[in-house]
Amino acid sequence: NGYLLIDVDQQEKKIEIERIHLEEDTAKQLHFDTYTLLDYNRCGVPLIEIVTKPNIRSGKEAAAYVEQLKNTLLYLDVSDCKMEDGSLRCDVNVSIRPYGQKEYGTKVEIKNLNSISNVEKAIDYEVKRQKALFLKNQTIDMETRRFDEQSKTTVLMRKKTSAVDYKYFTEDNIVPIQLDVNWVHQVITNLPELPHQKMIRYQKEYGLSNYDARVLTSNKELAHYFEATIAHYSNYKLIANWLMVETLGYVNKNNILLKNIKMKPQDLAKLVQLIDEGKISSKQAKNVFEQLMQKEQSVEEIIQKMNIVQINDSNQINEWIQQVLQEFPASVSDYQAGKDRAFGFM
């Protein structure tokens, strides 16, 4: 009765889980144009296979499910989930059927998809391929295919001989394990807040949009940084914007990990507070932000060094204006005569 909730186009959907079982890894396949290499370095490494029920209806939903599963595993410290390294992989089964038909069509398996984007692309292509065969009254064979990243198509690996053709062997030295229901409930009760739960809380508690909450919770470290920052200042929306735009932009541009940045949560909170109070402009704040990212220092130290505090005292500002007008009477006359460039000069 397990499931994960996904969010696609702001619509929530429950993806049910059929079962979870343990396996041993065999080898990593490296496919080339005319041959395939096998890397046996991870042979015998234990892995968890999580099988969903067939209620995923598109490549987009499948990608959202893998993303949610990945985030859940990361939140629970189960795995680093690096798809490019093979620590998280995805096989998909694709079938089509006419509207109104209850029985599923012939299932085609696509093996070892190594990125979330490829999951979506492979499914979308395979659906089109099967539709084309169906409309031509051609047979859709039960087979195993792989996704070719160059051509963005699925390529035949082998034909299947039966509906159950998994090529696996049971481990006779390990008896079946029956998990106690009370133990399962205890584990569930003690789980930390999971990404989907956190996303809903961010919307309700902090008034964030669905998009903002989804981005912030898509990365465990980002969510922790956000919560550490709002503990010091409570403009949730502005802090979220600075994290999603400026911080993630800097991290991606410089190819660094979020956990390795120099800026501390309390410094970002102080920066946002100064913007709110009108003591520095957004442009000035970006300059301070760059300095915070490059070296461990406080906001106050940077502002003092850069001498960029914004003056909001209207009496002081009026006094300076009068000084400028008195110092440049010719420019005042030019502006009054319609020469706008004089204003820029002053």
Specify the residue positions occupied by each region the protein language model found.
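Generic, well-ordered alpha-helical scaffold segments in large soluble proteins
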Residues: 65-68, 72-75, 122, 126-130, ...
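Structural motif corresponding to the C-terminal cap of alpha-helices
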Residues: 73, 77, 251, 325-332
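Strongly charged, low-complexity linkers/loops
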Residues: 259-269, 282-346
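Basic, nucleic-acid-interacting segments
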Residues: 1-193, 204, 210, 231-235
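Conserved structured core elements
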Residues: 41-44, 59, 63, 86, ...
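Extended, charged alpha-helical coiled-coil/arm scaffolds that mediate oligomerization and mechanical coupling
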Residues: 278-279
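Core structural elements
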Residues: 86-98, 166, 203-225, 236-253, ...
